[in-house]
Structure formats: C-alpha cells, structure tokens
C-alpha cells in the first residue's frame, strides 16, 4: 500500500504521456483502496483478538485512531503545501504528500515482521490439526461469501451512518462552504484538524461505553445521533461563525461518527467465525466504504444541484442512510468475542 501511494507521487504529467496519466491514477487508486482493506482488517483483528475481553472495546477503538492520525497528517501536509504559489502547487507541489508516505513504509514493515498470529487464531489452527482437517477445503473468501453473506451485507449497511457524514464533512462540505458561503477552505481544514485531535479521547470514551453497554447499543446511539444532526450541521455551517461551525463538526464527527467508528472493530469481527473473520470483516468494511463513502461527495453534489445548490436533500440523504444503519444494528447480533486463550 505504501509503495502504491508513493507511485502516485511519481506519476508523469499529462503533458508527458497524455490520457495514460489519469488511467494510471485510477489503477493506482484502485490498488490503494484494495490494499487498505487488507491492512485495516489485519490491524483490527490483531487488536480485537489479542485484547482481554473486558477491555476489548477501548483497546480496539484505539486501532481506529490510526486512520485519524493519517487524516490529521494529510490535512497538515496539505495546509503546508497549499502555501506554495499556485503554479508550483499544480506543477510539483501536489506530489509532496504522496512522496512523504515512503517514510512510513519501513517502520510498518518492521512491526509487521515482529508480529505473531493471535492466540485465538492459533487455538483454531491447533483444533483444526487435532480434527485432522489441516487441508482447507475452501478459500476463506469463497467460504465467507457462501456461508456468511448476510453478515457482509449487514456491515455494508452499517457503514453508511459512519462513512456518509465523514465524507460529507471532510469533502463535500469543504467545497460547498467555500463556493456557496464564501468561507476560506483553510478555515474548514483547521476545523477538520481540530476534530481529528478531539477524536482520540472520544474514541477511547466510546470504546469504554461499548465494554459496558455492548457494541450494538453504542452503534444504534451513534446512527440515530447522526440522523438528528444532519440538518443542524448545515444550519451551524451557514452561520459562518467559527465557534458555531466548529460545534457543528464536533457534534456530527466527534459524537456521531466517532461513536460508530470506535466500535466497528469489535462489532464487525464478532459477526464472523474465526477462520473467515479476516476476510469477512475486510470485505464487508471495504465494500461499505466504497458504496457508502466513496460515492457520497458525488451524490451530495448531485442532490445539492437539484434545488440551486441547496443542502436540504443532502441532509435528507444523511438521515435516511443513518436510519438504515440504525435498523441494521438493531437486527445484528451483538456477538461477544471469546477471551484470548
């Protein structure tokens, strides 16, 4: 994944190879997203299956802050890069964030090679050997799609309440506030950075809540809160007040989004059996990210264009998707993962 990100920064310009440049960019972005699924699933399961049962929620919530750290670093680098002259930014400055990703590859490889399989998975492999079924009859991907496709579908729906408001606030709202409200893009980016910083303690808080109340209850709360905050978020944004706009982001992201994101590792992993947990969690989560999050900026842009760049339909879309996630959480089993041996 790190190599693919670095290669994006090395792409030749359109003037050099023409239409091949955007084609290569699409391919690299596809590969990047594909590999993120494997990285996220592996990191999440390592924490979930190593963690002691009564502290699993808070510890697995910390694993989700890795993405927030990336968002924080990316936003910070982007703010620095945008200080370059426009010509330099468009010529070579945009490459800097991608090239800097190479600095993270070696530490990641070092940590990866020092990790062993989790106790839960080792216990499963031991039992498998005892039962004389060392040869797997079916690949995990095929097995999980055939046997636990309902869990995959549930995760896709569950991700709407988490992904839609996140991409709405960090992508669509930045552009919309700049063009329609005349708010400087840097102002919104600073607010986004603040919410990223606040997300660290909020993830721990919601992780602790999941240990006490269960993942499903926290997820239902978060989804309903997102639905309730869809319209107020835009009202606060329209105020053009830094304090009120920040409040809108804190409510939608740090309470709504963070409560959902924090419990996803334990919640999603608990929906699958150990031999297919990695594949099932990753497939469901990443398909959900594509369907729920990837298309959100485009859907929001199209909906806003219906009524002369109004946000009303956009907020309505957030409400509907959040309610769908709340229903999915209601019917999903709040599975308790076994304690690590």
Positions of predicted regions on the chain:
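Hydrophobic core of transmembrane alpha-helices in multi-pass small-molecule transporters
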Residues: 18-37, 243-259
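A membrane-interface helix-boundary motif in multi-pass transporters
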Residues: 83-99, 302-320
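Multi-pass alpha-helical transporter architecture, strongest
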Residues: 108-115, 267, 319-341
């Amino acid at each position: 994944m790190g190599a693919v990100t670095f290669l994006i920064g090395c792409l030749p310009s359109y003037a050099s190879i023409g239409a091949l440049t955007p084609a290569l960019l699409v391919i690299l972005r596809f590969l990047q997203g594909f590999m993120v699924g494997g990285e996220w699933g592996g990191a999440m399961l390592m924490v979930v299956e190593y963690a002691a049962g009564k502290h699993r929620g808070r510890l697995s919530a910390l694993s989700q802050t890795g993405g927030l750290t990336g968002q924080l670093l990316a936003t910070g680098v982007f703010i620095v890069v945008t200080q370059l002259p426009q010509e330099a930014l468009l010529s070579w400055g945009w490459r800097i964030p991608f090239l800097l990703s190479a600095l993270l590859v070696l530490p990641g490889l070092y940590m990866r090679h020092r990790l062993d399989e989790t106790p839960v998975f080792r216990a499963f492999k031991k039992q498998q050997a005892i039962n004389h079924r060392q040869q797997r009859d079916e690949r995990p991907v095929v097995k999980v799609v055939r046997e636990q496709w309902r869990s995959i579908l549930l995760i896709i729906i569950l991700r709407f309440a988490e992904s839609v408001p996140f991409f709405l606030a960090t992508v669509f709202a930045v552009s919309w506030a700049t063009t329609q409200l005349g708010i400087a893009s840097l102002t919104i980016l600073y607010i986004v950075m603040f919410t990223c910083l606040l997300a660290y303690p909020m993830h721990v808080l919601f992780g602790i809540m999941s240990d006490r109340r269960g993942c499903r209850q926290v997820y239902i709360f978060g989804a309903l809160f997102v639905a309730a905050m869809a319209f107020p978020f835009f009202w606060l944004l329209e105020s053009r007040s830094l304090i009120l706009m920040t409040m809108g982001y804190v409510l939608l992201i740090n309470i709504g989004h963070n409560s959902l994101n924090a419990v996803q590792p334990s919640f999603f992993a608990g929906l699958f059996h150990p031999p297919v947990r990695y594949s099932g969690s990753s497939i469901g989560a990443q398909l959900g990210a594509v369907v729920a999050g990837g298309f959100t900026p485009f859907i929001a842009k199209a909906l806003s264009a219906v009524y002369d760049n109004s946000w009303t339909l956009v907020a309505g879309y957030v409400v509907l998707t959040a309610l769908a996630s709340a229903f999915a959480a209601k019917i999903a089993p709040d599975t308790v993962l076994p304690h690590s041996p």
